[in-house]
A protein has these predicted regions:
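Extracellular/periplasm-exposed beta-strand and loop segments of Gram-negative cell-envelope proteins
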Residues: 71-79, 107-118, 122-131, 160-169, ...
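Signature of Gram-negative outer-membrane beta-barrel scaffolds
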Residues: 149-236, 246-249
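Extracellular loop and loop/strand-boundary signature of outer-membrane beta-barrel proteins
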Residues: 27-34, 68-76, 84-88, 118-127, ...
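Transmembrane beta-barrel wall of Gram-negative outer-membrane proteins
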Residues: 1-23, 32-66, 77-105, 144-150
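Surface-exposed extracellular loop regions of Gram-negative outer-membrane beta-barrel proteins
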Residues: 10-23, 55, 63-66, 99-123, 165-169, 229, ...
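Residue-level signature of outer-membrane beta-barrel architecture
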Residues: 6-8, 48, 91, 132, ...
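Hydrophobic, lipid-facing positions within transmembrane beta-strands of outer-membrane proteins
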Residues: 2, 40-44, 60, 81-87, ...
């Protein structure tokens, strides 16, 4: 693992790069071990003050895990990973109003790869499941008095699911098959009132959401409330309640009894 960070320009911007690698994988490869497992991930962040009240930041993360089992004539591999990138603008409009705007992209995938060779007979196949998502969120924090603060904003996302796409080569013949992709569009508006006095804090809010998958549209209203008291020294008690909704897209692989969920 290693981290590199520093300033881009004095008192204006900075950068950070961090990476990790599972080094026993290299040892297993040198020893020609039949079973190998490894992972890596890379994190990067750039931050720059484009104005004394406006800060722009770019964040990127990519990670992957993989496992392989190799025998005399056969090799099986599995892998899963994700990549995400976000661009965020933090703004301070006055002493009582701040805002945050973020746009993001996320890619999730898992895969299975098999290869068999024996006496001129050769089979190879790879099956993948993928999810692409891009979206945006805008949030405002506004102080109305010394005990009352409002948080409000909007969110949007678009997801595309690509279930079970298989590529194979069987004795020189190429074959491709898979299910059609599915899409989900969702949006939300939210408002939260926060009251704070002494050790007491109360939150009362509501969120309205809509989900559309090209076949049907669903609406949801999600009220939420919380009351808490802070005794100090990391001791607090709270009571909360919320009604929450979530879109779930589920694909079942026909040769497994277990489902593969994306949410």
């Amino acid at each position: 693992a290693g981290t590199l960070d520093g300033p881009i320009k004095r008192d204006k911007g900075s950068y950070l790069i961090s990476a990790r690698y599972f080094f026993p994988e290299a040892v297993l490869a040198i020893a020609d071990n039949a079973v190998r497992y490894g992972f890596y991930d890379v994190t990067g962040k750039l931050t720059y003050d484009i104005h004394r009240n406006h800060t722009l930041s770019l964040g990127i993360y990519s990670g992957d895990d993989h496992m392989k089992n190799k025998e005399d004539h056969a090799e099986n591999g599995f892998g899963w990973g994700n990549t995400t990138a976000s661009l965020r603008l933090e703004s301070r409009w006055n002493d009582n109003l701040r805002s945050s705007v973020v746009a993001y992209y996320t890619y999730l995938q898992n895969r299975q790869e098999t290869e068999f060779k024996d006496d001129g007979f050769s089979n190879w196949g790879k099956t993948t499941f993928k999810t692409h998502e891009f979206g945006a969120r805008m949030t405002f924090d506004q102080r109305l008095s010394h005990i009352w603060m409002l948080e409000y904003g909007a969110a949007f996302s678009h997801q595309r699911f690509e279930p079970m796409h298989t590529k194979s080569i069987i004795n020189g013949q190429h074959k491709n098959r898979g299910y059609s992709s599915e899409q989900l569009v969702s949006g939300a508006l939210f408002l939260n009132n926060r009251f704070q006095w002494g050790g007491w804090r109360a939150d009362v809010g509501v969120r309205g959401a809509v989900y559309d998958n090209s076949e049907q549209t669903k609406y949801a209203v999600e009220p939420r409330a919380q009351l808490s008291y802070d005794f100090g020294r990391d001791n607090a008690v709270w009571l909360s309640g919320t009604i929450n909704s979530q879109a779930l897209v589920q694909f079942n692989r026909y040769y497994y009894s277990m489902p593969i969920d994306f949410w």
